[in-house]
Amino acid sequence: MKRLKRHLQVVFLTVLVFLTTSIRAQEATPRQLQEMDSVEIGLLTCSPGKEIYSLYGHTAIRVHDAATGQDVAVNYGLFNYHTPHFIPRFVFGLCDYEMGIYPFELFMEEYTEEGRGVIEQRINLTRQEKLDIINALTFNARPKNKVYHYNFFYDNCSSRARDMIVDHIHGHVGYRVNASVTSSYRVMVHQWDEQHPWDCFGCDLLLGVNADRKTTLRQQQFLPDSLRASFATAKVFREHQPPVNLVDSTWTALEAQAPETDSSFFDVFTPRVAISILTLLVVLASVSEYHKKKIYWGIDLALLLVDGLAGLVLFLMIFSKHPTVSLNLQILLLNPLSLVGLYSVIKKSRRGQYSKWLTMFAVCILLFFIGNFLQDYASGMNILALCLLDRCIVNYVVRFKDNNVLTR
């Protein structure tokens, strides 16, 4: 969820120091275990940013040794936005992220510049658990281990940080679960992108049926703030010991700056507004066509072309590695078959005839409406469906009324 860091030389030196300390700690002695008393390990939760990849916040780990002065941030959200074909690779679930270790001071500098807040939860760990986490981070930081296959819902900066901490606790971590609170991936994402209507629209356009299924508490922890909230009330159950809070203390390392209140044109001109205006114009044109008994085939050409191209994108998403996008009922509306039937529709329209491709499109649109019971669609999609259904109906009515015949 973050850009590739600057100061690569500093990062490299920091990793060397961290690795040296950790390798020494692997040969654990009672004294070295005692040295862990000065080590604090915390979960860092960062507030959302302005860029699309930072809308949902960020999670990192802090390792601070008060005795040596070593203070580093462990970040599982490093990527290079300028990598060739980054956006397509991200969309199709082919993007690689990597883990990086660098001075906590640099970590805070970036968030200060971006006006984002940082909350640290210091984790209640034993000496051995601290040592195990440091050794695991050392192993993870090796060049052959630091790169991982990113998945927004299942394997991201939050899940990696959670697993690094929880998997090295010698006991069981119990979370407080509210059975009355259920949520889907789509609803949870909306909590963070609903103030950005076009980003929200694009996300909803790609998410399919599986994004509307109920999630478990563990699945909900893909969001940084959800993980923070889960940790805040979690208990650690160690053998022959009373349960203790997972989080020893919480403090705000950096206050978030108040967001800018100035709204842009696209905050008002939302996808729903844009689609509504388009639909109104199309309906007005259809009324004119009905009275003049003449089809403006250019409208159908433009709509089918755009519809088919958008449908082609949804078709390609079937092959995406993201598990929540492959089954998407919106493909019944944004239909790649529009490109296949485009020639027939326009050819027959120019001859004053009706193409039965339009009948097939109308059936798909009706199935799309039924799909509302199974999937939440992107904002304005049902209005767009009415717009396209209007084109199917007006073509049928005008051609049938004018020629009283249907032709293939």
Question: Could you say what each language-model-derived stretch is?
Answer:
Residues 1-28, 404-408:
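Bacterial Sec-dependent N-terminal signal peptides
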Residues 14, 32, 49-52:
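Residues embedded in well-ordered secondary-structure elements
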Residues 27-40:
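A eukaryotic "domain-start" boundary segment
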Residues 37-115:
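Glycine-rich catalytic cores of cysteine/serine-nucleophile enzymes that process amide/ester linkages
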Residues 49-50, 116-124, 143-152:
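Second-shell loop/turn segments in exported
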Residues 58, 71, 120-122, 158, ...:
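Extracellular structured ligand-interaction cores
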Residues 128-137:
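Short, charged, amphipathic alpha-helices and their helix-cap/turn boundaries
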Residues 139-354, 361-408:
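Activation targets extended, charge/polar-rich intrinsically disordered C-terminal tails
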